């Protein structure tokens, strides 16, 4: 449906982000090698990662590996989440966790991860 609805946005919540680089690489490889089979080229005309970087967001609350691989995960494609009130979350220490995880990142990247990407994904009209 991402091909059919190019403005549709999806978010993978509660899944962290460290797995995304491998899945994107593998999906693109399989698409490249096998797209002529079974009409895949008609259904998915571009590499799968194209749709991810254009329309999909990953969410994380405690993923050092994912943040270490921001270039491949896509700095414009991820959002910090708290996962409150689940037991597998950083609450009530979400603020401290976010500061620990992202304190070394540039301010513009922190803004995107903490607020900017969510604003973009949801089509909101907020200023910094």
State the predicted function of each range:
Residues 2-51, 64-76:
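Histidine/acidic residue-rich metal-binding segments in metalloenzymes
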Residues 54:
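Short beta-strand or tight-loop elements
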């Amino acid at each position: 449906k991402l091909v059919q609805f190019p403005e549709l946005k999806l978010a993978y919540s509660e899944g962290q982000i460290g797995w995304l680089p491998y899945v994107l690489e593998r999906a693109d490889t399989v698409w490249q090698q096998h797209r002529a089979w079974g009409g895949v080229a008609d259904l998915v005309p571009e590499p799968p990662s194209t749709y991810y970087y254009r329309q999909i967001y990953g969410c994380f609350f405690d993923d050092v590996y994912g943040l270490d691989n921001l270039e491949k995960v896509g700095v414009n494609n991820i959002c910090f989440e708290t996962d409150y009130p689940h037991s597998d979350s950083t609450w009530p220490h979400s603020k401290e966790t976010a500061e620990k995880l992202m304190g070394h990142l540039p301010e513009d990247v922190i803004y995107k991860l903490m607020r900017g990407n969510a604003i973009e994904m949801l089509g909101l009209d907020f200023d910094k």
